Amino acid sequence: MYCTINGERLELPDCTVADLLAARGLTGKRLAVERNGQIVPKSQHGATHLQDGDVLEIVVAVGGG
């Protein structure tokens, strides 16, 4: 299946949001995931299966001052 992640169209295996984050080395990081214009709560990352054509934005929080 193909999904667009942060503006880049990628071919992905069947997976959940949690699987995608793990594959990208983002597990445990402070971040927000938007799927097709809707925020995916962290509690739903493991239950949210990606579908062909999904558009995701993954934003990682960066501390500093």
Model feature map: region roles:
Residues 1-64:
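Ubiquitin-like/PB1-type beta-grasp interaction modules and other compact soluble beta-rich domains
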